């Protein structure tokens, strides 16, 4: 108070005022501070000071022809004196007002196109709903978030090339537009921005906003998708939050969300197949998300999630060096350790072989709902500081940290046997066994851990074995903090390797990720995910397997037909028939297979009994290992819609219905495609079955005599030509092959050439 009074007295004296307002600043340090460098040191002050002047703006001399010297009120708009040090004119802020009211108008058609991201933001805010403001402590943690809704995911180099091509098409310099998205965007933007009068630099800047993901490391409590981040300043303060529902979604958030769902589904499915890595790659390459190839999205999208990172590692892309355990991302912040195998005994006297980390280390742990700092030594937890949204989330983090510490009291807290298995029915590794065990029930773990008295530290409280907060006592080494732990900010990516069981390791051999770490959470994707791989047919249930299997046969009928007649075993072993087996009652699989294979063999042996529809219908049943039995079936059962449904061996049924008139097949009422050729008994089969060893040369040639019947063909000598009658009275010219090779390709070309010859 004294100081303020003193200052007031000083200010009341005119001399003080004069010194402060009139005296020049001549202290070198101060002058240096405010004049060195191009960076403005006090922009707000500079702006106020400039705008108080009469002519704070400079403009090109041409402005004198475009704007009158005075406005309607007689106020001067520009001064005849030149700006010191340049040949520009000094202009009043009033000139801007005059220009806005009376200046030339231009077409506004391009504005919404160029400033698309702004217009869309306004729409989202207009349709968004703001709820009540609540006052409460905010646990914010810094996360890397996307601050730019509505962007494509091009790299800055790719975007640069697109921008140059769109905005400065005539500039020199090599531009390589390779990716599909680059080409599509360039074409679209060139059309949109034809005759655009907006300054090219502005267009380039706005295009960059549309094409490139911009991320910042910001303190966030709550939603992290870009439509929430754009209103961060409205939804959360230091001690308050405001509920908000965005008024629209943007594609980039949808891509991120759908990518995570697709990756999780693919990793889960690959983990149970015979060769997980090969299956995973096959699925990533054949999946599309919102019409874009998943592998293209993986290359461009920086989303860090366990399943997504496993897919990236499989493709040979770099990923973050942090590792995952129990759904938390661990990042070592200091210390180091060496690994050693050690055998330990659980409370149930079961022996576990664990890889012990020897040495002092500190980690940050970041999960979706809780974060922590962990300090540990060899098999000992020294300190754990946790913060989380609620009791449950905090407990999850404590369990993971206790298991990770590998302490003896944790291993001794195991009751019962550890025999958890993964989706492929393989035993989990010991650390994940322990984790699963305590995630199911951690009572004994918390009870046996031990408690200790605590000091009163600001912002920290203790936590008891029943997970209630306490100010006097706490679980040994564990404290709960009001402050969150920031996510690891670095965007550094490292080279990793992946084994066939999808375990991802860094170059020192540390396991960063494994399928056990992939979340089981199911969600509904925002964008359509199209899994073309047969391995993913099961994801939508038995009906989808049935429809997809038949669709696949029809789509690939040309090749299937040839394999059916020449190399059936190879056909039966195709992975596309695997999912179908789960629909056939276990007891009947072998019998059905034996029956169908015998039936097919008869068709091959007896000319003219080839029946396309029947082969398509029964083919999936022949894929199971056959049992030799004399059993005959008039119908085969498949388990769909919760019960057994019958497929008739001869004739239509609700499951498999072929319409001769439209040549279309419906499976369970869903369209499964059209048969491209006439499935009349005898024709197609005879062509491919009989013309083996013959080359079709083209249409009938009268010089080679009358048309022979198919049976007379066998009398031809090698290299001899003849006309032959096939199918429904069509005649083609053939030559008997000189050597008995490439019989398979014969049938393929035969079918194609017969068509060409007939047409």
UniProtKB/Swiss-Prot annotation:
GO MF annotations, alphabetized: RNA binding; RNA-directed RNA polymerase activity
Record site: Avian adaptation: 627
Location (main, coarse): virion
Single GO BP term: DNA-templated transcription
Record's subcellular location: Virion; Host nucleus
Transmembrane intervals: none
Keywords: Cap snatching, Eukaryotic host gene expression shutoff by virus, Eukaryotic host transcription shutoff by virus, Host gene expression shutoff by virus, Host nucleus, Host-virus interaction, Inhibition of host RNA polymerase II by virus, mRNA capping, mRNA processing, Viral transcription, Virion
Coiled coil: none
GO cellular component term, pick one: host cell nucleus
Family of the protein in this entry: Belongs to the influenza viruses PB2 family.
Name the UniProt record assigns to this protein: Polymerase basic protein 2
Lineage: Viruses, Riboviria, Orthornavirae, Negarnaviricota, Polyploviricotina
